[in-house]
């Protein structure tokens, strides 16, 4: 039997950011998460699912104790677009192994080509998650989150490309990002 997918709703990066800020300030609650979710979804079932996902992406995230310990560095990093992309991607990947597995697949293909198709990702992910019917739905939740975070682009429907940050264009970091992208994430 394959792994479980675990995510079935897209959560806006802005919502994750607000939830993390509330959690770091000590004012996060289940009701706060429900209020955030109600801004994105209608209906009690969808709001409850989203509330659970928001909690998992913020206060119940395995990275939260580390971020809480390094709160000042976190706030400084959130001011830089490239750092934000890595932070949000890390939060998603730490909370959901599906996100991590999708990122590994993307990284392997970005290592050798500039574009990756949705169908290619689905084919590779089905070897991990079997022919789970929730696989395409989960991918359509995770990929827009990566796009909104600023990690990847979608130049056309079903095609994804890496994001290059100008701050890295003339530094050795750009070489590392181009050649070892799948290791970094």
Q: What is the meaning of each model-derived region?
A:
Residues 158-164:
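Minor-groove-contacting beta-hairpin "wing" of winged helix-turn-helix DNA-binding domains
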């Amino acid at each position: 039997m394959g792994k479980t997918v675990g995510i079935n709703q897209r959560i806006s990066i802005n919502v994750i950011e607000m939830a993390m800020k509330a959690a770091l300030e000590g004012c996060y609650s289940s009701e706060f998460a429900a209020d955030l979710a109600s801004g994105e979804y209608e209906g009690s079932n969808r709001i409850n699912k989203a509330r659970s996902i928001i909690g998992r992406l913020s206060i119940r995230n395995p990275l939260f104790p580390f971020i809480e310990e390094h709160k000042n560095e976190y706030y400084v990093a959130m001011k830089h677009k490239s750092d934000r992309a890595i932070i949000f991607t890390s939060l998603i990947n730490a909370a959901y192994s599906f996100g991590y597995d999708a990122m590994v697949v993307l990284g392997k293909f970005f290592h050798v080509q500039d574009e990756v198709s949705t169908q290619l990702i689905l084919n590779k992910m089905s070897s991990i998650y079997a022919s789970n019917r929730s696989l395409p739905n989960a991918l359509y939740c995770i990929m827009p989150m990566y796009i909104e975070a600023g990690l990847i682009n979608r130049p056309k429907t079903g095609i994804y490309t890496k994001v290059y940050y100008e701050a890295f264009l003339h530094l050795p970091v750009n070489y590392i990002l181009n050649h070892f992208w799948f290791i970094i994430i």
